[in-house]
Amino acid sequence: MVIMIKHLASFALCAAALFPTFSQAKYQPVTIDNCGVTTTWQTPPQRVVTIGQHETELLLALGLEKNIVGTAVWFGALPPSLQSAGKGLTRLAENAPGFEAVVAQRPDLVAAQYTYHVGEQGEVATRQQFAGLGINTWIAPADCVGKSLTAGSNGDGGRDKPFTLDLIYQEIDALGKIFGVTDRARALAATLRNRVAQAQHTARDALKHNAQGNVVFWFSSTRLNGDPWVAGSAGAPGWIARTLGLTNIIHTAEEWPAVSWETIARRDPDYIVVASMARRLYPADDVEQKLAFLRSDPVTREMTAVKRNRIIVVPAMSLNPSLRNVDAVEAISQRIAAFHTGS
């Protein structure tokens, strides 16, 4: 069951009423280094194309929906509390947009969730290509700080330093300064911190009399009966596990390594967190097919988590570095509490 969390965007719905916009307050120029590119902002961006759902949701949560002129790279629907603010957004593409489609929106800023799309080998374009047209770029710090591709990593890369939500808080702070909405940014970060603290309390209460605390996070697979992409210990799911007092059974710095079901079964997780998404690039993108596989495959159906039906479904967005990591912390803590109270 997907647990929908309401808090995040309810903040955004009233943000404009609570705080003055940058047009109403004196803008303070700011210089910020972002993933190796230093930019001085003399005025806030007016026309933004977001490439990556996290960037879209972050701007919506800051009450900046009127600044978004195009979006791309969607994993699923917006959370209910952001849907009203985001209902008029233009989708240039569900996945990566073309360079021309982005430029046609006449953006003064392109904000990307992944260096894969806007980086040295950018699938959409490089930062230099955009700069040549006078377009500034922004890449989510969580996709470049402490992260790298190695000879042994897949396209998702690995982490030199474990992810924490501090990277998201840093991005909120930086974008608050860039757009001149620092009050909104501070309030959003405070709301997220309070929600994390409450989720930790819920998980501690549920686990204090129970030894079971091993977890695996399954994102997708190219084939249902092939090796699944599961979360390593240094990415966002690793932070989620540590925050809730759980132990990720996959001990690698790679973000989403492919690991055999036989290996996972030997480690026998107490909980399996499964990603739900609208994307359909691979058979295992479909959460219903994932669940059916877990309950029917001769190897997976013998795992403790499957036998006890301790499977937790969360939106895929909440397992990648984003605001929605807080949604995942809440959803997982609530389900664990329900498992151990029988509710």
Please state what every model-predicted region is.
Residues V2-I3, A9, L18-E57, D160-K161, ...:
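Bacterial Sec-exported substrate-binding components of ABC uptake systems
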Residues I32-G36, T90-E100, A253-S260:
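Short helix-initiation/N-cap motifs at beta->coil->alpha
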Residues R47-E120, L246:
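A short, structured surface patch at a secondary-structure boundary
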Residues H54-L58, W74-A77, L109-V110, T115-E120, ...:
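Solvent-exposed loop/turn segments at secondary-structure junctions
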Residues G76-L78, D227-W256:
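Alpha-helical, coiled-coil/dimerization segments enriched in small aliphatic residues
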Residues F99-R106, V124, V259-D268:
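Short helices/loops that flank or line small-molecule/ion binding pockets
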Residues P162-E171, V274-S343:
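Structured C-terminal subdomain patch of bacterial secreted/periplasmic proteins
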